[in-house]
Amino acid sequence: MTDQSRQPRDKNYNLIAVLYHSSDNVESLKTYINDAEQEGDQELVDFFSAVLENNLTAAQRAKEMLVSRLQNEQE
């Protein structure tokens, strides 16, 4: 496989993928936090909550970057 065949068709593909996966992870992490709370495992609650915040930050940043890039393409 050549390097060229691995390149995405859309220049924003990887950014969109990060937005999708970060958002998807948020939903999973909410479940993990709930499970840990039900089990009384505060260490896991804290860990999953920190990971959740990282994913929320990544998703928000990806959204902002994508909006900016798409607006610049329109100009």
Predicted segments, located by residue:
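Iron-associated oxidoreductase/ferritin-like identity signal
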Residues: 1-75
